[in-house]
Design a protein with these regions (language model features):
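Conserved catalytic cores of very large enzyme subunits
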Residues: 98-99, 105-471
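Charged, amphipathic alpha-helical regulatory modules used
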Residues: 2-106
Length: 475
């Protein structure tokens, strides 16, 4: 064993220590004891020697890492017919890792708080919608714990290491939730807000002012059950019947829309972050809704959505004027981000609303425009969720089942960014570039698959009560 003693072991913290075979045999001892297996000292010593033989080829410059030695222990135990002992060793190895992480976490709590208070961590300003405040500190602290949970308890080492090494970036690790979602405004109008046992339930809104208040509360609640944007589609189409039913004047309509816009720009997540919200405005009544009876107060009215074009124009005018005016200091509103559908039926004439729309666009650059001219898609085929996600419902309809592919209630489980510049920098040939990319794409896809399973399980178990209610009740 004299030759073996010359090798050095590189520890996880980078320190180098002399190789000692006794540490291998001690770990194998514990694995056999855990399974209550009979063994002799000679057998343990023999297995230890086989381990040293197994990792010979891994030694570089007379050095080998702890992880490489542990991999060899697992291989040798399995090859020797002790698969159950190997499993016990793997669990022992994982437990040791958790203990190390726990020690690190205990030491890091002070650093986590100080890095936020002293603005030393880039994450303090990662989200432009979060204000530096005690509420932001609460989000930062809980986010650090949750991110560590994802990386140490849920994702496997390959995924966690790829994120820690910046080969990929897994977004929103600070929240144990899905990414973004689009919700059925029709369902909210039909059923009201609530449905959670033991909590206050609101009846379907009968007036525009009440509906605007319910939408603000709904988006604020959903922001706490999802990491990213929350969206409503056909905003102007669904709100117009409330204007018609109460024969509201334009000043009354504008007052309601103002309350909605101010409401969704008020911080509601720990008092520090406004809901990231997106609304799609049809501008003209879409074909899939035109012939349907309008709904107010949860009941069908004696008129259809196509009969509410004048009221739609009032909704759109009130929304755009409020966005142009900004707040009391003249500052533009961040939310909601409006998306407008441009179809062959879009009226390009010099109307008041058209002038206002493009004035808002030129002043703030706020709206997104979905171009359906010369397209085989219709506005009803697309749901805009946020600044980087648009879902093609035609593709979702090909999928069967699942909480994330059912009509209007659609969304995204998560987002992963691949570090393409690093791949390009490290690759010497196009072939190497694509090989590296393939590997990271597989890792990214697996991380999203794992996240989908975890979020689906937590949804079933009731961790997201309002989302569960709106995803499972009939519409």
């Amino acid at each position: 064993m004299g030759a073996l003693d010359m090798f050095q072991v590189v520890k996880r913290d980078g320190e180098v220590d002399e190789f000692k075979i006794g540490k291998i045999t001690a770990a194998i001892h514990k694995a056999f004891d855990a399974k209550e297996k009979n063994y002799s000292e000679e057998m343990i010593d023999l297995l230890g020697l086989r381990v040293t033989s197994d990792f010979q080829k891994k030694i570089t410059d007379n050095k080998i890492t702890v992880e490489e030695i542990q991999d060899s222990v697992e291989n040798v135990l399995i090859q020797a017919g002790y698969a159950d002992v190997a499993k016990a060793y793997i669990l022992y190895r994982k437990q040791r890792e958790k203990v190390r992480n726990m020690k690190s976490t205990i030491l890091d709590y002070k650093e986590i708080v100080n890095s936020y208070v002293k603005v030393e961590d880039w994450r303090v300003k990662e989200n432009s919608t979060v204000t530096y405040s005690v509420g932001g500190l609460i989000l930062s602290n809980s986010g650090a714990v949750t991110a560590n949970y994802w990386l140490s308890e849920i994702y496997d080492n390959e995924i966690a290491d790829a994120h820690r090494n910046a080969d990929i970036h897994i977004h929103d690790l600070s929240m144990l939730t899905g990414y973004c979602a689009g919700w059925s405004l029709k369902q909210l109008i039909q059923e009201g807000l609530g449905g959670i046992e033991g909590k206050i339930t609101s009846s379907p809104a009968k007036h525009l002012s009440v509906l605007c208040n319910q939408m603000v509360n709904f988006l604020g609640i959903m922001q706490n059950e999802w990491a990213g944007a929350q969206a409503f589609s056909s905003f102007d189409t669904y709100l117009a019947p409330f204007v018609k039913a109460d024969n509201l004047s334009y000043p009354e309509v504008k007052k309601c829309i103002e309350s909605f816009i101010y409401g969704v720009n008020t911080p509601s997540r720990w008092g520090t972050q406004a809901p990231f919200s997106n609304i799609t405005l049809d501008w003209t009544v879409p074909d899939d809704l035109a012939e349907l009876p309008a709904i107010v107060g949860g009941k069908n009215m004696d008129f259809k959505y196509k009969d509410c074009k004048k009221e739609m124009d009032m909704i759109n005018k009130a929304f755009i004027e409020t966005m142009i005016e900004g707040d009391a200091n003249g500052r533009g509103f961040q939310y909601p981000i409006p998306t407008y559908s441009i179809t062959n039926e879009f009226d390009w004439s010099d109307t008041e609303n058209n002038r206002l729309l493009f004035e808002m666009t030129s002043k703030y650059g706020t709206p997104y425009f979905s171009n359906y001219i010369n397209s085989d898609m219709k506005p009803s085929d697309i749901r805009s969720m946020c600044c980087r996600l648009r879902l093609d419902l035609r593709e979702l309809r090909k999928k069967s089942g699942g909480f994330f592919g059912s009509g209007e209630s659609t969304g995204s489980v998560g987002v992963v960014t691949i570090n393409m510049p690093r791949i390009a920098y490290l690759s010497k040939t196009p072939e190497e570039f694509y090989n590296r990319l393939d590997r990271l794409m597989d890792i990214s896809a697996r991380s999203l698959h794992i996240k989908r399973e975890v979020i689906g399980k937590l949804l079933d178990e009731g961790l997201y009560p309002v989302s569960y209610t709106h995803l499972t009740l009939p519409t």
